[in-house]
Amino acid sequence: MAVGKEIRNQIGSIKSTQKITSAMEMVAASKMRKAQERMQATRPYAEKMRQVIGHIAKSNKDYRHPFMQEREVKRVGYIVVSSDRGLCGGLNTNAFKLLVREMREWKQQGIETDICAIGQKGASFFRNYGGNVVAAVTHLGDSPSADQLIGSVKVMLDSFVEGKIDRLFLISNEFVNTMTQSPKALQLLPLPEGDDEEIGHQWDYIYEPDSRPILDGLMPRYIESQVYQGVVENLACEQAARMIAMKSATDNAGSIIDELQLAYNKARQAAITQEISEIVSGAASVG
């Protein structure tokens, strides 16, 4: 019964793979919870930082920090956040599609794009795609720190100050819930105008000697905090997407095993029926 043996081998192989995907699902679920906690802890800081920057900027209207200066767009920069590893569904692909679409739109206007890639998948994809990757940082691990991002982010900030790029955007995945992660594009530079009502009625600070040195010191930290928030949120998205992908793979493996088991039972039944028929035929011929 060669066919039956082959099916048994297939079932054994798929069961082994199913154990691996099931284990990966549980690991991803555990990492996702930790990543969610980190994401929720950093969100208030990033939001408060945005409000503080907006308030300080409005308190000194005579001074325009370089990060707030609008100019004609001739070249743009993107910081794109991706994962270092795969097996996380379409998470990276969706973010890459968003950036590629925006790159094409800029290209139609005669505007080129510089890319800072955070994550191995993004760096590899855009280098192969032909994008101008001017900075990259990979292998951040499951607990990334802001210090790991400073070097690559500074490359883009310096490019903006020096006039090499005229706008800077961040592309990352937003954690909606465990089942849904959505890619988004956020303008970092020049700093978008804040909501007057949101900013104007919360504080009444006195700055001594003035707000300019405070703004100069906080601006780079603000951009770094926004990028770090994007990285932390993308990590939570990655683990959620991986958990869902591995659960789907485990469930699919179970369905395939059931189908193969049915095929094996049919093959075994056919073999037994054939043996009985041969025995009956042999007995009849002897009789």
Swiss-Prot record:
One cellular component (GO) term of this entry: proton-transporting ATP synthase complex
Listed InterPro entries: ATP_synth_F1_ATPase_gsu (IPR035968), ATP_synth_F1_gsu (IPR000131), ATP_synth_F1_gsu_CS (IPR023632)
GO biological process, one term: proton motive force-driven plasma membrane ATP synthesis
Subcellular location: Cell inner membrane
Membrane topology label: Peripheral membrane protein
KW Membrane (keyword) present: yes
Keywords associated with the record: ATP synthesis, Cell inner membrane, Cell membrane, CF(1), Hydrogen ion transport, Ion transport, Membrane, Transport
Matching PROSITE patterns: ATPASE_GAMMA (PS00153)
Pfam families the UniProt entry points to: ATP-synt
GO molecular function (one): ATP binding
Role of this protein: Produces ATP from ADP in the presence of a proton gradient across the membrane. The gamma chain is believed to be important in regulating ATPase activity and the flow of protons through the CF(0) complex.
NCBIfam families from the UniProt entry: ATPsyn_F1gamma, PRK05621.1-1
Subunit structure: F-type ATPases have 2 components, CF(1) - the catalytic core - and CF(0) - the membrane proton channel. CF(1) has five subunits: alpha(3), beta(3), gamma(1), delta(1), epsilon(1). CF(0) has three main subunits: a, b and c.
Similarity comment text for this entry: Belongs to the ATPase gamma chain family.
Protein name according to UniProt: ATP synthase gamma chain
Phylogenetic classification of the source organism: Bacteria, Pseudomonadati, Pseudomonadota, Gammaproteobacteria, Pseudomonadales
Encoding gene per record: atpG
